[in-house]
Amino acid sequence: MSWLEKILPKSKITTPRRHNIPEGVWTKCSACEQVLYRAELERNLEVCPKCDHHMRISARARLESFLDEQGRTEIGAELEPQDVLKFKDSKRYKDRLSAAQKETGEKDALVVMKGTLKGVPVVACSFEFSFIGGSMSSVVGARFVRAVEESIKEGRGLVCFSTSGGARMQEALFSLMQMAKTSAALDRLSKAGLPYISVLTDPTMGGVSASLAMLGDINVGEPKALIGFAGPRVIEQTVREKLPEGFQRSEFLLEKGAIDLIIDRREMRNRLASLLAKMLNTHVIEE
C-alpha cells in the first residue's frame, strides 16, 4: 500500500443493483434491428413503428384485431388432425402435431371465425405459420370448406389471410387433395355471387399459393411479403441465373399484375371493410 492510499479515506466500491426485467418485455425488429417494447409492438399489430416492417402475427391475434369484437364465433374448432398414415421422417408426425399444438395453442394451422367487419357480415380465415409452417392439411382444407359453406349459407363475404409453406408432406396425397377441394369450394362461392378477398402475407408459398391464396376476386398483399410457388433459392439453382431484385415480393407481383393491391396491416380493417361493403351492396358502420 502506498503512502497516498494510507492518508486518503477508504471508499466503498458498490456495484449497481441488477434489476430483474421479465423475459419478453423487449424484442428486436428483424429488419432494422431496433429494440422495441413488446406491448407497443402488439398494439401496432406486429408492425415495427420504426421502419414499418411487417413481422409475423399469430392467426388468432390477427382475426381478433380484424373482426368486430362483438359476435365473433369460431368455426370448425372441433376438427383435429389424425395421423392416418402413421408417417415418420426424422420425427413421428404425431409428435410434430403435439409439439405444434403445445407451442401455438391451436389444433391445426387454420383458424376460422365468423362475425362482422365494421358491421359488414364476413367469415374470416387465417393461417398460423408457427404450426408446422402453416402447412395445408386435411383439417385446414375441411375448415376452409366450412368457412365457404357458412358464407354461402348466411350470405357473408369471405376473407382469408394466407401464410404457408405449402401442402403438409406428412399427409401426402391427403394434403395435396385439399388444393382441389378448396378450389372447388371457392367455385361454389363464386356461383353464389359472394365475394372472396385473399390476403397474401409473408410467406405464402407452395400448394397454398397455387390454390386458394390466388383465387380471390381481389388478391391483396402485405408489404414486402414473399409470395410464390418455389422459393427464390430453388429457382436460382434451377435456372442458374440471378433473379431480379425483389423477385417474388408483393411489390414485384403488383407491378407484374399478379396481385391487385398492397395494404398495410394497420389499414387492412378499414380498407377491406370498404371493399366488402361495395361488393355486398351494404354499408360500413363507422366507429
UniProtKB/Swiss-Prot annotation:
Catalytic activity: N(6)-carboxybiotinyl-L-lysyl-[protein] + acetyl-CoA = N(6)-biotinyl-L-lysyl-[protein] + malonyl-CoA
EC numbers: 2.1.3.15
MF terms (GO), sorted A to Z: acetyl-CoA carboxylase activity; ATP binding; carboxyl- or carbamoyltransferase activity; zinc ion binding
Associated pathway: Lipid metabolism; malonyl-CoA biosynthesis; malonyl-CoA from acetyl-CoA: step 1/1
Needed cofactors: Zn(2+)
UniProt feature coiled coil, ranges: none
Record-annotated CoA carboxyltransferase N-terminal domain positions: 25-287
This protein's record includes keyword Nucleotide-binding: yes
Domain of life from the UniProt record: Bacteria
Binding positions (Zn(2+)): 29, 32, 48, 51
This protein's UniProt keywords: ATP-binding, Cytoplasm, Fatty acid biosynthesis, Fatty acid metabolism, Lipid biosynthesis, Lipid metabolism, Metal-binding, Nucleotide-binding, Transferase, Zinc, Zinc-finger
Location (main, coarse): cytoplasm
Zinc fingers (C4-type) by residue: 29-51
Annotated signal sequence range: none
Record SUPFAM superfamilies: ClpP/crotonase (SSF52096)
GO biological process, one term: malonyl-CoA biosynthetic process
Keyword Zinc: yes
Subcellular localization, as worded in the UniProt entry: Cytoplasm
Listed GO CC annotations: acetate CoA-transferase complex
Cofactor mode of binding and number, as noted: Binds 1 zinc ion per subunit.
Pfam families registered for this protein in UniProt: Carboxyl_trans, Zn_ribbon_ACC
InterPro entries for the chain: AcCoA_carboxyl_beta, Acetyl_CoA_COase_Trfase_b_su, ClpP/crotonase-like_dom_sf, COA_CT_N, Znf-ACC
Family assignment from sequence similarity: Belongs to the AccD/PCCB family.
Subunit structure: Acetyl-CoA carboxylase is a heterohexamer composed of biotin carboxyl carrier protein (AccB), biotin carboxylase (AccC) and two subunits each of ACCase subunit alpha (AccA) and ACCase subunit beta (AccD).
Function of the protein: Component of the acetyl coenzyme A carboxylase (ACC) complex. Biotin carboxylase (BC) catalyzes the carboxylation of biotin on its carrier protein (BCCP) and then the CO(2) group is transferred by the transcarboxylase to acetyl-CoA to form malonyl-CoA.
Stated name of the protein: Acetyl-coenzyme A carboxylase carboxyl transferase subunit beta
Gene (UniProt): accD
